[in-house]
Amino acid sequence: ADCQAGDSADKLLAQKQHDVNYLVYKLYGDIRDDHLKELGETFNPQGDLLLYHDNGASVNTLMADFKDGRLLQKKHWFSLFNTRQREEALMMHRVLMNCKNWHAFVSNAAYFRTNMNEGEYLYALYVSLIHSGLGEGVVLPPLYEVTPHMFTNSEVIHEAYKAQMTNTPSKFESHFTGSKKNPEQHVAYFGEDVGMNTHHVLWHMEFPFWWEDSSGRHLDRKGESFFWVHHQLTVRYDAERLSNHLDPVEELSWNKAIDEGFAPHTAYKYGGYFPSRPDNVHFSDVDGVARVRDMSMTEDRIRDAIAHGYIDALDGSHIDIMNSHGIEFLGDIIESSGYSANPGFYGSLHNTAHIMLGRQGDPTGKFDLPPGVLEHFETSTRDPSFFRLHKYMDNIFREHKDSLTPYTRDELEFNGVSIDSIAIEGTLETFFENFEYSLLNAVDDTVDIADVEILTYIERLNHKKFSFLILVTNNNNTEVLATVRIFAWPLRDNNGIEYSFNEGRWRALELDRFWVKVKHGHHQITRQSTESSVTVPDVPSLQTLIDRADAAISSGCALHLEDYESALGLPNRFLLPKGQAQGMEFNLVVAVTDGRTDAALDDLHENTKFIHYGYDRQYPDKRPHGYPLDRRVDDERIFEALPNFKQRTVKLYSHEGVDGG
């Protein structure tokens, strides 16, 4: 074969990829791989307890509930916010995390795929592949092809069923929810993008709110990461709104009506349609979840903590948050996650708000409706109220960040290093293009009938490739390690009024963050848009992953899917917001900071992927997310006088309906 022959590790990885592909292919039917199907039917999880690090404690717990018939049946919806369903998924997750080798892992996965609820199983499988060393290098098949009904309008799913029944290969156009009468529909391409939905759900798998360190390890900067990823989603959504002549999103308020209703036009695979919410609904108490006044009280306690500058811990001590690590503790109590310093007192503002919003169509449970779109991370960004909820959270975080002392010139300067100029090679131009994905997993079928190809296509934003050209001078006599931080924010609001530096920097979109060694003298840094560490490329389709893994197994070649290993990051196609046909002005800012003092670990520049968490999952950059724009700026002259900081106005063009190069 014309390829690089794989070693034993490569061969095992190709086998793992093959196994994972078939563990999720046709999720709601029988396993289509003979070996895995046999494991699913004959493997006894309790047959050899030496297969597990915990000597079988986790598997005994799960099997006891399974044998007692206590587990959720198959063909039923699953929501992570449902306490019992989450616990069942986590029981399986603990079994997989305790497997000593791939044989044990895949045998249990095949067994529970055959015997457990599909949603619980899929969640446990993906979270375990992300967090277990056994899953390293495995590419997670795109969720929009594994569970297409969570990402695709039900009208299209019905068409897919018809095509399957008549055995007709078909391709259907998908449309975004709502009609042109609804102004929110103009930005549906962002909230309803299949890659954006996947980014959101995978981030919450990488940093689950239920995680405790007994699960195996500490998740570095989890609370701060919760703030930052949702802050970026919020400011990017606002940039898309401005691109479409809409005002930035208003924050949600517990005592005001939720202006925008939402009709999801999506249905559960089993369990009926996702509930709708009419316009102008006032918040109602939700039976068994929370009262509206509890939510206001929780918010007041969090704001009090910010005003006091400390969090009351469970043991009565005070945790000081008036420093760059305060955001970490604050994120944990706002979400709230298993790391919260005092869940009893500070409640669970974010998670409960998701359920409250999801249930406003049926707050008393009178109609016994299934969970709303906000009760699933896969579907929540489809509802415009998701961004209103996160604007509300974001403003609480901002209150904290604005209470911190602004950075001084001494703190921001990089001795001997200056930026001479910043430029862009190529044009900043976006366009829409059709994106296809398979609906094969959406339809039921039997092994005897051959599958026909059923695809859907939908418009997705993308941009022409471009590069940043940054000219720097190093006047030190030695080579230095520099961290390059690139941001941009919309220059004006929807009324054409220019944002002040302090307003703009809070609205800044992070475009890239990377290390580079700079020798003495002048140096040009060229960075391509495709290299951005804040984004990831679209993952290959499930069929492509199947073909690639099977080809690697039969040829003995290495698989080479490294580019898709980490799913953490925005879809690369969304690196730039849409912009406007006549050009929309953005303020582009570049800061070059001292990589040696920024690095949380030594020799880290060898691993340039910031977002991918570096060695052993420790976050490589010890500066706060958003640095140096994360604190308020009372006097922008400090930044204007910094040699290692540069800004310029750039124009971002949207090329409606024309394919770009």
From Swiss-Prot:
- How is this protein named in the record? Hemocyanin subunit
What positions does the entry give for Cu cation B binding?
Answer: H350, H354, H390
Query: From which organism does this entry originate?
Result: Scylla olivacea
Q: Which InterPro entries match?
A: Di-copper_centre_dom_sf, Hemocyanin/hexamerin, Hemocyanin/hexamerin_mid_dom, Hemocyanin_C, Hemocyanin_C_sf, Hemocyanin_N, Hemocyanin_N_sf, Ig_E-set
Q: Does the keyword Disulfide bond apply?
A: yes
GO MF annotations in UniProt: metal ion binding; oxidoreductase activity; oxygen carrier activity
Entry-linked SUPFAM superfamilies = Di-copper centre-containing domain, E set domains, Hemocyanin, N-terminal domain
Q: A cellular component term (GO) from this record? A: extracellular region
Entry function: Hemocyanins are copper-containing oxygen carriers occurring freely dissolved in the hemolymph of many mollusks and arthropods.
The cross-references to Gene3D superfamilies, in alphabetical order and at most eight, read: Di-copper center containing domain from catechol oxidase, Hemocyanin, C-terminal domain, Hemocyanin, N-terminal domain
Compartments it resides in: Secreted, Extracellular space
Q: Where does Cu cation A bind?
A: H200, H204, H230
Tissue distribution of the protein: Hemolymph.
Quaternary structure and partners: Hexamer of a number of different chains.
